[in-house]
Structures are given as structure tokens and as C-alpha cells.
Swiss-Prot record:
CDD domains: PLA2c. InterPro entries: PLipase_A2, PLipase_A2_Asp_AS, PLipase_A2_dom, PLipase_A2_dom_sf, PLipase_A2_His_AS. It is found in: Secreted. PROSITE patterns: PA2_ASP, PA2_HIS. One of its GO terms (biological process) is arachidonate secretion. Snake venom phospholipase A2 (PLA2) that is not toxic by itself, but the synergistical mixture of a basic and this acidic protein is lethal. PLA2 catalyzes the calcium-dependent hydrolysis of the 2-acyl groups in 3-sn-phosphoglycerides. The active site is at H62, D104. This is Acidic phospholipase A2 VP8.
């Protein structure tokens, strides 16, 4: 348990909202965020090619959403949010942080709605299998 806490603290330092996004993912899917950390062509660092399934498309849309955020770094931003009646509610006054939260909220909901498409064959998916031309956001 102590090692997990140390890893979580280190990950938060690397990517400010990773922990928050992970909590959203777990709330909507009951799966660890690690299940989505290296999945398909878009879940995880970077992304290229064609999304492999609806789950991977959630990550593609999430990447596109981050690309529209202006005024803060989505990967380093810590935002306000809460869980109310099974829903994720983004809060706070900063429009940029709220936009980052919305990107994460929509992706977490998307993962929950597409759990039936999650296929373990796309876990640890090689980017060499993602050589098709990338779609436009």
C-alpha cells in the first residue's frame, strides 16, 4: 500500500490532474485508470493513427479536447470537481481549469459508456500498429 501511495504522489507531480482524472475514470467504470494508460493508439502518451475501438476513440476525443484548451497546461492543471448523484460536476471560477475538467469528465463518461468495447488485445498496444493516417479533430 505504501508503494502505491508513493507512485500516486510521483504521478501527481508529473501530471497534475492525472490523479483527478483517474478518480473520475474509476467512478464511471470501476476500473483502474491504469487500464487506460497504454491502450490502443490514443490512450496514454501521444497518439497517432486510427482509434482501434470506441474506447480508444474516447482517448482520441480527449486528446482533441486538450488541444482546444487555452491559458493553462491540461496535463499540469489541478481543477475543482465533485461527484453528485453519480455525475461528475466541474467547478471553480478559472475557465481554463474548468475546460480541462470538462475534457476529463467527458472522457471518463465515454469510458463508462463504452466498457463493452474494451478489449485486452489493445492493452500495451504497439504504436507500430498505429501507422494509418491520423484523423483530424
Amino acid at each position: 500500500m505504501r508503494i502505491l501511495w508513493i507512485v500516486a504522489v510521483c504521478l501527481i507531480g508529473v501530471e497534475g490532474n492525472l490523479y483527478q482524472f483517474g478518480k473520475m475514470i474509476f467512478k464511471m467504470t470501476r476500473k483502474s485508470a491504469l487500464s487506460y494508460s497504454d491502450y490502443g493508439c490514443y490512450c496514454g502518451w501521444g497518439g497517432k493513427g486510427k482509434p482501434q475501438d470506441a474506447t480508444d476513440r474516447c482517448c482520441f476525443v480527449h486528446d482533441c479536447c486538450y488541444g482546444t484548451v487555452n491559458g493553462c497546461d491540461p496535463k499540469l492543471s489541478t481543477y475543482s470537481y465533485s461527484f453528485q448523484n453519480g455525475d461528475i460536476v466541474c467547478g471553480g471560477d478559472d475557465p481554463c481549469l474548468r475546460a480541462v475538467c470538462e475534457c476529463d469528465r467527458v472522457a471518463a463518461i465515454c469510458f463508462g459508456e463504452n466498457m463493452n468495447t474494451y478489449d485486452t488485445k489493445y492493452m500495451l498496444h504497439s504504436l507500430f500498429d498505429c501507422m494509418e493516417e491520423s484523423e483530424k479533430c
